[in-house]
Amino acid sequence: MPVQGSQRRLLGSLNSTPTATPHLGLAANQTGARCLEVSIPDGLFLSLGLVSLVENVLVVTAIAKNRNLHSPMYCFICCLALSDLLVSGSNMLETAVILLLEAGALAARAAVVQQLDNVIDVITCSSMLSSLCFLGAIAVDRYISIFYALRYHSIVTLPRARRAVAAIWVASVLFSMLFIAYYDHAAVLLCLVVFFLAMLVLMAVLYVHMLARACQHAQGIARLHKRQCPAHQGFGLKGAATLTILLGIFFLCWGPFFLHLTLIVLCPQHPTCSCIFKNFNLFLALIICNAIIDPLIYAFRSQELRRTLKEVLLCSW
């Protein structure tokens, strides 16, 4: 994805030197300020991408195989896995191509590399946007299932879910193409940051409201069975811990990347900001880590999906 100082990374690899920074790193700070730069080895970067790729392929395969999982909720989970798969796959492809170019093992004209870079950028950006959208869609789906339980199947139908999925993919591709074309405009970067904050607020509000309803429900059950208050408090603490982990992982994995975009707009030449820019590889690795964690949170907790996944793995042997 084009960002200040790292755009056209594949083209830069055609004339690379042994000190060139691979995939998505920014130029070294020229101000002389001491910076903390976390180096992400190419092997680690590719390994994270491979783990994410395998995990999300398994999720998509299991949902596609089991007709019992062809519901709106699993439709969103499947699309989230597909988005995460594309995030990991596109970055693995870019890293591999850059390494091959730098090693001289791949010969390509600049025009071909330019087109490949553009395609990878669009895939990466659109899959990131769609991943955020599907995280929000899953939160909305769960909210409706709790607060409108009796009407859920009439509100969230499979045709509506499919239309929502199609709209998300189309919008993600279109906006990613706009971003790639106008990445040097501050308004475009700020729109991406606002979009991330909107998704964060949406998820926080919905999940906090769901936690409050669950605590009220648990309290009602405790009163019905004349239980003591500590049982309800324990449920509330467990729910709060789960919510903190869910939102915390989302913020920690995605936040640094969007902080990077914000600082490009606010202080592109400031020494401190330049130090942060040098850790862009780390920020991207965190997003790939989120792609690894998403299946654990949203998919593998389903007993039906785990059973189907076991069948898929046994059949593959």
Swiss-Prot record:
Which biological processes are named by the entry's GO terms?
A: adenylate cyclase-activating G protein-coupled receptor signaling pathway
Main subcellular localization, coarse class? membrane
Entry's SUPFAM superfamilies? Family A G protein-coupled receptor-like (SSF81321)
Which residues bear sugar attachments? 29
Supply the InterPro entries for this chain: GPCR_Rhodpsn, GPCR_Rhodpsn_7TM, Melcrt_ACTH_rcpt, MSH_rcpt
The UniProt transmembrane annotation reads: 38-63, 73-93, 119-140, 164-183, 192-211, 241-266, 280-300
Q: Indicate whether Transmembrane helix appears among the record's keywords.
A: yes
Q: Which UniProt keywords apply?
A: Cell membrane, G-protein coupled receptor, Glycoprotein, Lipoprotein, Membrane, Palmitate, Receptor, Transducer, Transmembrane, Transmembrane helix
Ranges in the topological domain labelled Cytoplasmic: 64-72, 141-163, 212-240, 301-317
The compartments listed are: Cell membrane
Q: How does it sit in the membrane?
A: Multi-pass membrane protein
What GO molecular function terms would the record report? Answer: melanocyte-stimulating hormone receptor activity
Any single GO CC term annotated in Swiss-Prot or TrEMBL for this entry: plasma membrane
Q: Which domain of life is it from?
A: Eukaryota
Q: Which residues lie on this side of the membrane: Extracellular?
A: 1-37, 94-118, 184-191, 267-279
Covalent lipidation (S-palmitoyl cysteine), chain numbering:
315
**Which family does the record assign?**
Belongs to the G-protein coupled receptor 1 family.
Please describe what this protein does: Receptor for MSH (alpha, beta and gamma) and ACTH. The activity of this receptor is mediated by G proteins which activate adenylate cyclase. Mediates melanogenesis, the production of eumelanin (black/brown) and phaeomelanin (red/yellow), via regulation of cAMP signaling in melanocytes.
Subunit details: Interacts with MGRN1, but does not undergo MGRN1-mediated ubiquitination; this interaction competes with GNAS-binding and thus inhibits agonist-induced cAMP production. Interacts with OPN3; the interaction results in a decrease in MC1R-mediated cAMP signaling and ultimately a decrease in melanin production in melanocytes.
What name is this protein filed under?
Melanocyte-stimulating hormone receptor
Question: Upper taxonomic classification of the species?
Answer: Eukaryota, Metazoa, Chordata, Craniata, Vertebrata
